[in-house]
Regions:
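Helix-to-loop junctions at the C-terminal end of transmembrane segments
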Residues: 60-72
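Structural signature of the two symmetry-related core transmembrane helices
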Residues: 75-89
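Helix-breaking motifs and short loop linkers at transmembrane-helix boundaries and internal kinks
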Residues: 40, 72, 93-99
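Membrane-interface helix caps of multi-pass secondary transporters
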Residues: 30-40
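Paired small-residue
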Residues: 83, 87, 98-107
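Pair of pore-lining "gating" transmembrane helices in MFS-fold secondary transporters
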Residues: 5-30
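Residue-level signature of mid-helix packing/kink "hotspots" within the transmembrane helices
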Residues: 26, 53-62
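Cytoplasmic helix-loop-helix junction between adjacent transmembrane helices
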Residues: 103-140
Length: 140
């Protein structure tokens, strides 16, 4: 049973994962055929946009811990949530390929950092005897 004081921890880990995977990574994957159909980009260009996001994921996963040490994990989480939101909004209208590439790269960096830091921050704040119960629920 989840205790009332654990709900913020559970939501932090869950929302970081949802934002990092759902919005930052996969939200635009489903829209890529429509972007081609609408004439925003060619099929080859959307492949590069996907690569930009994956490159961002690599950078973000490697940079998450050093950034958290330097800036504090909570601050990094907030900055990354804002970056995902801005990237999501910026990619909602046609713009030059290079700019879209940068936004997808930013989305990947921020998304990976959210996935790495969110659950670990939440779990470190949880009581040790409750971690085995709370951890799996963050990834439902």
């Amino acid at each position: 049973m989840i205790q009332r004081e654990e709900i913020p921890l559970l939501l932090t880990g869950f929302m970081a994962t949802l934002s990092g995977v759902g919005l930052a990574r996969f939200a635009y994957t489903a829209l890529m055929p429509q972007m081609v159909h609408a004439g925003w980009f060619s099929g080859e260009q959307v492949a590069y946009l996907g690569a930009a996001n994956l490159l961002g994921y690599l950078i973000g996963a490697l940079a998450a811990a050093p950034l958290a040490e330097r800036m504090g994990a909570l601050r990094v989480l907030v900055v990354c949530w804002v970056a995902v939101m801005l990237s999501f909004a910026a990619c909602s209208f046609p713009q030059p390929m290079a700019l879209f590439f940068v936004w997808r790269l930013i989305s990947g960096i921020a998304g990976a950092a959210l996935m790495v830091l969110g659950p670990s921050v939440a779990m470190s704040a949880a009581a040790p005897q409750r971690r085995a119960t709370l951890g799996p629920l963050m990834f439902c």
